[in-house]
């Protein structure tokens, strides 16, 4: 309550001497409201603050010995005309001597609920909305007493003689004005700066479309089973995982079987399908329908796994690091002749077999060396029945192609 009013409701008692007379700026006497109280009139009724603040009780109280009557409500309304706001006005509080010993010194009536409600109703009915002003001084003509504004700078209290208005302090009024401004601002529509709006773009859901060979450039994966793309050359390679064998030291059973490199993704996928049919039969998963491989199924039935894989490699577009379709044959990059090599025979290194004018001569040289080191299980470019296997295996050196081919073969050449 005290914070809302901006002043204390329990002011100290103050009795002014009757000898104190103040002069206005024009030299006239100033009538003081809080003087000329008789300390011996204990039987007289003492006015209460509730009666001063109530609009319904317009009781006139004697002020001095001259029986000067001042109507409190009239003075309040007179001194607070509409259109003025007392900013710098000090709070006016009437000071009465404690004439009744039964009354408390702290004017506890303001602290009761009824007094607070009366004061609020007085504020709502008797105090209009005031515009801002710095000073307010009023003089009432035609009355027996001169009323003027007088402020006591020493005590900080307004000692205006007949001014009984309890004006709101500057802080309380500013709080009320601020509250009204806040309510007005809430009712205003909120304006949004269009320039600072963020454009929230919802991500469009992309439909899953099967990848094409052009879209998968630079990626190692493919839309086909068993096909990968070389990260450097961009060519497609086909691989098959053979889980029928396990070497020592391997954590995963089986080995990867290389089926050759291809320029087109579909060719690599077909090579995988043919190898899968040879290893696991027609019930395996394929990239294309089984009806597309009717002719190839007849051929693969006449060969074992190694021979069929060798045939797939020879038919690939980039076999054995060169342009030749034969196993172990490469083309020299300077003079363009064909070279034959075989690997993993001499200390796990490649063995150079010579340079030849044609791919077929180089391929025959590779077949003879493969039979020499691997026997009848060797994977050759041509049919192994063309060669004299016993003579090749019994020789301490690698024989030439003429000696290897013309030698008669009795038996044991069927794989």
From Swiss-Prot:
User: Does this UniProt record's set of keywords contain Transcription?
Assistant: yes
Q: What are this entry's molecular-function GO terms?
A: DNA-binding transcription factor activity; transcription cis-regulatory region binding
Tissues and organs where the protein is expressed, per its UniProt entry: Expressed in roots, seedlings, inflorescence, and siliques. Also detected at low levels in leaves.
DNA-binding region residues: the ranges are 223-289, 325-383
Question: Which superkingdom is the protein from?
Answer: Eukaryota
Localization per record: Nucleus
Q: Which InterPro entries match?
A: AP2/ERF_dom (IPR001471), AP2/ERF_dom_sf (IPR036955), DNA-bd_dom_sf (IPR016177)
GO term, biological process aspect, one: ethylene-activated signaling pathway
Function description: Probably acts as a transcriptional activator. Binds to the GCC-box pathogenesis-related promoter element. May be involved in the regulation of gene expression by stress factors and by components of stress signal transduction pathways.
Q: What is stated as this protein's family in its record? A: Belongs to the AP2/ERF transcription factor family. AP2 subfamily.
Instruction: Quote the protein name from its UniProt record.
Output: AP2-like ethylene-responsive transcription factor AIL1
């Amino acid at each position: 309550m005290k914070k809302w009013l901006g002043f204390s409701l329990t002011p100290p008692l103050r009795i002014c001497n009757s000898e104190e007379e103040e002069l206005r700026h024009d030299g006239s006497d100033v009538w003081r409201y809080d003087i000329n109280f008789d300390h011996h009139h204990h039987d007289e009724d003492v006015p209460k603050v509730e009666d001063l603040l109530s609009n319904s009780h317009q009781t006139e109280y004697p002020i001095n010995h001259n029986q000067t009557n001042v109507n409190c409500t009239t003075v309040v309304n007179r001194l607070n005309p509409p259109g003025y706001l007392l900013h710098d006005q000090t709070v006016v509080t009437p000071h009465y001597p404690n004439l009744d010993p039964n009354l408390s010194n702290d004017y506890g009536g303001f602290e009761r609920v009824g007094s607070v409600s009366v004061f609020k109703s007085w504020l709502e009915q008797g105090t209009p909305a005031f515009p801002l002003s710095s000073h307010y001084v009023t003089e009432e003509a035609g009355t027996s007493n001169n009323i003027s504004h007088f402020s006591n700078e020493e005590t900080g209290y307004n000692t205006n003689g007949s001014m009984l208005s309890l004006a709101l302090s500057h802080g309380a009024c500013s709080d009320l004005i601020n509250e009204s401004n806040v309510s007005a601002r809430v009712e205003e529509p909120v304006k949004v700066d269009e320039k600072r709006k963020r454009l929230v773009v919802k991500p469009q859901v992309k439909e899953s479309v099967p990848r094409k060979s052009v879209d998968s450039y630079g990626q190692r994966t493919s839309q086909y089973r068993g096909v990968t793309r070389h990260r450097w050359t961009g060519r497609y390679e086909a691989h098959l995982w053979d889980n029928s064998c396990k070497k020592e030291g391997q954590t995963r059973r089986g080995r990867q079987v290389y089926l050759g490199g291809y320029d087109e993704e579909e060719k690599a996928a077909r090579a995988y399908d043919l190898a899968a049919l040879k290893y696991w039969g027609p019930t395996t998963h394929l990239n294309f329908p089984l009806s597309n491989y009717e002719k190839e199924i007849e051929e693969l039935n006449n060969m074992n796994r190694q021979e069929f894989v060798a045939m797939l490699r020879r038919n690939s577009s980039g076999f054995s690091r060169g342009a030749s379709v034969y196993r172990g044959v490469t083309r020299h990059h300077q003079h363009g002749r064909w070279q034959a090599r075989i690997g993993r025979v001499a200390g796990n290194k490649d063995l150079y077999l010579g340079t030849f004018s044609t791919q077929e001569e180089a391929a025959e040289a590779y077949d003879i060396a493969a039979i020499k080191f691997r026997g009848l299980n060797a994977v050759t470019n041509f049919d192994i029945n063309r060669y004299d296997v016993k003579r090749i295996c019994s020789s301490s050196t690698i024989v030439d192609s003429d000696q290897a081919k013309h030698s008669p073969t009795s038996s044991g050449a069927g794989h």
